[in-house]
Structures are given as structure tokens and as C-alpha cells.
């Protein structure tokens, strides 16, 4: 049986994705995903591999194709008791 993982910490961030404009156009959305992972890992003191992006956030990053991700995203970050971190798009 799988038991619910307990949320230890919840925070909201506005992540600026301005740096994606410094990367070639055909790599921007993928770079934005990595940028979000590194940002959250740095702020919550976990490894980037432990950061899981939600489906709505991923769809928002890729909505205008690979070349034009948004300039900034509003996210809700939840750290679970097993050390993983969930990142969801703020509604």
C-alpha cells in the first residue's frame, strides 16, 4: 500500500526566465525547464534530480513552442518528507 507523502514546506515563487533569451532559439523551452529545476534546487537545498515539475507547468513552458517560453512563471513549490520537491503552476 502506498501512503501519502507529507508536505513539509510550501512556498510561492515568481521565477524569471529572462536568461532563456541568451540561448539559441531551438533550445529555449528545454533550457527553461533546467533553469526552473536549478532555481528550486538552490532555494530548497536539494539536488536538481529531486525536483519534479507538474504537467500544467510543463505545458505552460511549451505552449508557444520551443522558441518562445514565457518570460516569467508563478509557481507553488512543495517539499515532501522524502526529500522530493513538487513544482506546480500557480492558479
UniProtKB/Swiss-Prot annotation:
UniProt xrefs under PROSITE patterns: RIBOSOMAL_L31E
Keywords per UniProt: Ribonucleoprotein, Ribosomal protein
GO BP of this protein: cytoplasmic translation
UniProt key word Cell division: no
SUPFAM superfamilies: Ribosomal protein L31e
HAMAP family recorded: Ribosomal_eL31 (MF_00410)
Stored NCBIfam families: PRK01192.1-1
Family: Belongs to the eukaryotic ribosomal protein eL31 family.
Protein name as it appears in the record: Large ribosomal subunit protein eL31
Organism: Pyrobaculum calidifontis (strain DSM 21063 / JCM 11548 / VA1)
Gene name linked to the record: rpl31e
Amino acid at each position: 500500500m502506498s501512503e501519502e507523502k507529507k508536505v513539509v514546506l510550501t512556498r510561492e515563487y515568481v521565477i524569471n526566465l529572462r536568461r532563456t533569451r541568451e540561448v539559441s532559439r531551438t533550445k529555449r523551452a528545454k533550457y527553461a525547464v533546467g533553469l526552473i529545476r536549478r532555481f528550486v534546487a538552490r532555494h530548497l537545498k536539494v539536488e536538481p534530480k529531486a525536483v519534479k515539475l507538474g504537467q500544467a507547468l510543463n505545458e505552460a513552458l511549451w505552449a508557444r513552442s520551443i522558441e518562445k517560453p514565457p518570460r516569467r512563471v508563478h509557481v507553488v513549490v512543495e517539499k515532501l518528507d522524502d526529500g522530493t520537491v513538487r513544482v506546480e503552476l500557480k492558479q
